């Protein structure tokens, strides 16, 4: 049989030997020695393979399929699966789960035994049963070894000093005080490990463990960048902490989800919003928080959709709330409808005309800084003028200057066209308490100015120059005749539109009675024997032109018309300037157009006209120049 084995074994050819000389022949000698040993042991090769396979099977049966430890005590489940007692007890004691580790079947009770080859279907005598974890123990030894896994024994103490410390905190204090050692409390809390499984470190070892980790793949416990010295078991716990305790920019998260940006609190996040994104500065959105957009286009769309009411009828410029200086206060968008006046009579008592922006109430320190910044801007950073400005404010605060005197001083100091002294008055008022007399005096000046601006913006007042004042009459300028129906109706209709008039009573109806209208006859139908006369009446400032042919007969009017006329007179309306008289200048020479039918025909009148023209030309040329050639008309075309 050995000869047959020798015949079957054929040496394999090494092709590297044909490529040239080899410098090192040691690998070749090793292969030759290996082949000799293999030839000698070929007879006993088959029995050795059988023995090794049996040993491997026994070793696999003695190892836990979960942790690969050698089985000392086993956990048998009703689903006929077997694990070590440590893995089975960890599932029930630390994870609080009763499912099988292999097939995930829920098992209310399992069995812990020292019979490694046993099966759940065999008969066992149970000596102890733990109701809390649902475990049946077949021996006291198994029960003791299993339940001792939960106890806090110190492995560094002597046998007679071993005791249960009851918690990780007391166990760590004992290690630190007695042995100058400690455990990682982060691992003890989150690792789901028994106390005896936790590694014991020195101070430096613990620091390296938490910051650097180890060579087995553990990279250390991550630390929160905002909470000093606070570390977490893994990135999952750190993410939960950052989500609950800190703020994340959702705009940056959308643009780059791989690297989200976190901030300590909302104040830091809002600073990031202001510098990196576009914030809606309307007060309602500032109160709601997180109203921020990626670009300016989205911000404008939000303002038009959510705050369109503050843009209707208002200036088209939007001033940011974040700056403490406003260059043009009249162009700031306000939340309230400052220019929608319900009636003229409500202006003195109303405060809706104030130029209040949407900035929330600021502190006195911010108001002083805003006042100083605006004053320096108006004074072009003149130190001397700013010292005067500060002295005026100090005199007013100490009572040496009244509010009116302060306003006059401001007007003399701030002479630039862009300087708004009333806005400075308003800023100075904000530095005083709201209920103080100094605040009320300054604010009264500011409110009065705002009402005037609002009135001018609503409807500009008419000119009240005495040189342009004229009474309104029917077909008569500058006279004292009774007003016509059209003028009366126009005056009554425009009462509410004039800012200087008093509002009529609600019960008065200018359209209650009808007014009889006298229609004017056409001028060409009036027959007169005498030429029309035009009367002129001169005054100091105006010229009254009243054509007599426009005078209509004075008819009796209704009582309501007289009443309305008296009311118009009592209103003292400003008189309108007189219109310039229309002058029609007639033409000097009336053109004579020839009949087209007579063109080309001889007529005596045409010949006589031609000869007359020639005679005139000869006469004029002969008078001017007695000698020389005379111009003659050779032919005449057209007219």
UniProtKB/Swiss-Prot annotation:
EC number: 2.3.2.27
Region (Disordered): 1-55, 343-367, 550-631
Subcellular compartments: Cytoplasm
Catalytic activity: S-ubiquitinyl-[E2 ubiquitin-conjugating enzyme]-L-cysteine + [acceptor protein]-L-lysine = [E2 ubiquitin-conjugating enzyme]-L-cysteine + N(6)-ubiquitinyl-[acceptor protein]-L-lysine
Subunit structure: Interacts with the E2 ubiquitin-conjugating enzyme UBC4. Interacts with histones H3 and H4.
Zn-finger (RING-type) residues: 64-104
Name this polypeptide is given: E3 ubiquitin-protein ligase HEL2
Domain LIM zinc-binding positions: 222-292
Positions of post-translational Phosphothreonine modification: 57
One of the record's GO molecular function terms: ribosome binding
Enzyme class: transferase
Similarity section: Belongs to the ZNF598/HEL2 family.
Coarse class of the protein's main subcellular location: cytoplasm
Comp. bias intervals (Polar residues): 7-26, 43-54
Biological processes annotated in GO: histone catabolic process; mRNA destabilization; negative regulation of gene expression; nonfunctional rRNA decay; nuclear-transcribed mRNA catabolic process, no-go decay; protein K63-linked ubiquitination; protein ubiquitination; rescue of stalled ribosome
The organism of origin for this protein: Saccharomyces cerevisiae (strain ATCC 204508 / S288c) (Baker's yeast)
Keywords of this entry: Acetylation, Cytoplasm, LIM domain, Metal-binding, Phosphoprotein, Transferase, Ubl conjugation pathway, Zinc, Zinc-finger
Annotated pathway: Protein modification; protein ubiquitination
Residues carrying Phosphoserine: 354
């Amino acid at each position: 049989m050995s000869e047959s084995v020798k015949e079957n074994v054929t040496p394999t050819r090494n092709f590297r030997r044909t490529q040239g000389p080899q410098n090192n022949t040691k690998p070749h000698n090793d292969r030759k020695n290996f082949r000799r040993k293999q030839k000698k042991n070929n007879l006993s090769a088959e029995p050795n393979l059988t023995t090794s396979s049996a040993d491997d099977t026994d070793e696999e049966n003695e190892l836990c399929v979960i942790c690969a430890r050698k089985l000392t005590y086993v956990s048998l489940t009703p689903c006929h699966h077997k694990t070590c007692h440590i893995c089975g007890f960890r599932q029930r004691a630390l994870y609080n789960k009763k499912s099988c580790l292999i097939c995930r079947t829920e098992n209310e009770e399992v069995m812990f035994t020292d019979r490694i080859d046993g099966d759940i279907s065999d008969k066992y005598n149970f000596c102890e049963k733990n109701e809390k974890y649902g475990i049946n123990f077949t021996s006291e030894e198994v029960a003791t070894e299993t339940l001792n896994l939960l106890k806090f024994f110190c492995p560094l103490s002597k046998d007679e000093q071993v005791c249960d410390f009851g918690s990780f905190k007391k166990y760590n204090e004992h290690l630190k005080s007695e042995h100058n050692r400690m455990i990682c409390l982060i691992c003890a809390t989150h690792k789901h490990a028994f106390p005896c499984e936790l590694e014991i470190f020195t101070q430096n070892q613990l620091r390296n463990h938490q910051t650097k980790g180890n060579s087995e793949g553990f990279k250390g416990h991550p630390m929160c960048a905002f909470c000093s010295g606070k570390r977490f078991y893994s990135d999952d716990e750190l993410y939960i902490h950052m989500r609950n305790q800190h703020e994340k920019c959702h705009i940056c998260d959308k643009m780059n989800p791989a690297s989200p940006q976190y901030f300590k609190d909302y104040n830091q996040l809002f600073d990031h919003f202001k510098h990196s994104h576009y914030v809606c500065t309307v007060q309602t959105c500032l109160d709601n928080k997180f109203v921020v957009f990626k670009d300016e286009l989205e911000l404008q769309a939000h303002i038009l959709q959510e705050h369109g009411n503050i843009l209707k009828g208002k200036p088209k410029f939007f001033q940011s709330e974040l700056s403490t200086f406003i260059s043009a206060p009249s162009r700031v968008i306000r939340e309230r409808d400052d220019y929608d006046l319900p009636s003229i009579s409500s202006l003195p008592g109303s405060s809706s005309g104030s130029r209040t922006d949407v900035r929330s109430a600021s502190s006195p320190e911010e108001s002083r800084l805003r006042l100083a910044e605006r004053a320096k801007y108006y004074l072009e950073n003149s130190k001397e003028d700013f010292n005067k400005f500060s002295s005026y404010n100090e005199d007013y605060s100490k009572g040496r200057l009244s509010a009116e005197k302060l306003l006059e001083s401001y007007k003399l100091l701030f002479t630039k066209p862009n300087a708004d002294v009333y806005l400075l008055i308003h800023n100075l008022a904000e530095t005083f308490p709201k209920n103080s007399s100094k605040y009320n005096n300054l604010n009264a000046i500011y409110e009065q100015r705002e009402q005037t601006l609002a009135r001018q913006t609503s409807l500009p007042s008419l000119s009240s120059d005495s040189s342009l004042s004229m009474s309104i009459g029917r077909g008569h300028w500058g006279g004292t005749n009774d007003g016509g129906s059209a003028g009366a109706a126009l005056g009554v209709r425009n009462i509410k539109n004039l800012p200087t008039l008093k509002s009529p009573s609600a019960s008065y109806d200018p359209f209650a009675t009808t007014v009889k209208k006298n229609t004017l006859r056409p001028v060409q139908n009036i027959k007169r024997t005498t030429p029309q006369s035009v009367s002129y009446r001169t005054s100091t400032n105006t010229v009254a032109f009243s054509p007599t042919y426009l005078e209509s007969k004075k008819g009796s009017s209704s009582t309501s018309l007289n009443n309305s006329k008296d009311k118009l007179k009592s209103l003292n309306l400003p008189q309108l300037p007189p219109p310039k008289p229309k002058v029609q200048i007639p033409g000097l020479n009336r053109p004579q157009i020839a009949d087209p039918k007579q063109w080309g025909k001889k007529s005596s009148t045409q010949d006589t006209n031609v000869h007359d023209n020639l005679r005139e030309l000869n006469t004029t040329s002969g008078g001017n120049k007695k000698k020389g050639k005379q111009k003659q008309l050779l032919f005449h075309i057209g007219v």
